[in-house]
From Swiss-Prot:
Keywords: Ribonucleoprotein, Ribosomal protein, RNA-binding, rRNA-binding. InterPro entries: Rbsml_uL18_euk. One of its GO terms (molecular function) is structural constituent of ribosome. SUPFAM superfamilies: Translational machinery components. It comes from Thermococcus onnurineus (strain NA1). Belongs to the universal ribosomal protein uL18 family. This is Large ribosomal subunit protein uL18. GO terms for cellular component: cytosolic large ribosomal subunit. It comes from the Archaea. Pfam families: Ribosomal_L5e (PF17144). This is one of the proteins that bind and probably mediate the attachment of the 5S RNA into the large ribosomal subunit, where it forms part of the central protuberance. One of its GO terms (biological process) is translation. Part of the 50S ribosomal subunit. Contacts the 5S and 23S rRNAs.
Length: 201
């Protein structure tokens, strides 16, 4: 509702909570491709996007479903380990497409230190993509590998196996014991690296 004669209605995408136009303008002024990271409750998505007057163009993209389909990821798509693996994947895809640098675009997600959007960033940087950042914003290594999830699962299983099976049913139905998530993480990470490193040779 208007608040007086000087009230200005915000742009539609701002009203809908989709675009911060001040931040978007600053990103566009850099002239670099954008590493766009978005997340939902169950998944993450990453894209390399370049500005075009007729509309932004997506050069490459990756989704956590792709980790499950192509690399055998059995963990949750919305957690920190899957976010890192997604970053690794989009980083390699970007390099393959000739993109060597980008600037991070997390949209309206709050820039909370250690959040999963910064796990995507770390994965992309580890793949060789040059993105300006401070390493202080990265999640701790034990969160990236999923060790915190494994430790919680172990404790819960000892305390209440019924609750353990209910909470981690999506892992168990795929044949993954959540206590072994760090090992599984390393296996999937190795598959991603192997695929793209072999393609370079």
């Amino acid at each position: 509702m208007a608040h007086g004669p000087r009230y200005r209605v915000p742009f539609r995408r701002r009203r809908e909570g989709k675009t911060n136009y001040h931040k978007r303008l600053a990103l566009l002024k850099s002239g670099k491709p954008r590493l766009v990271v978005r997340k939902s409750l169950n998944h993450h998505i990453a894209q390399i996007v370049v500005y075009d007057p007729k509309g932004d163009k997506t050069i490459v993209s990756a989704h956590t479903r792709e980790l499950m389909r192509d690399f055998g990821w059995k963990g949750h798509g919305g957690n920190t380990p899957s976010a890192y693996l997604l970053g690794l994947l989009i980083g390699y895809k970007a390099k393959k497409a000739g993109i060597d640098e980008a600037i991070l675009d997390i949209g309206l997600h709050p820039p909370t230190r250690g959040s999963s959007v910064f796990a995507v960033l770390k994965g992309a940087v580890d793949a060789g993509l040059n993105v300006p950042h401070s390493e202080e914003i990265y999640p701790e290594d034990y969160r990236i590998t999923g060790e915190h999830i494994a430790n919680y699962a172990k404790a819960l299983k000892e305390e209440d196996e019924g609750k353990y099976r209910k909470q981690f049913s999506s892992y168990l139905v795929k044949g993954l014991e959540p206590e072994k998530l760090p090992e599984h993480f390393e296996e999937v990470k190795a598959r991603i690296i192997e695929k793209f490193e072999e393609a370079r040779e």
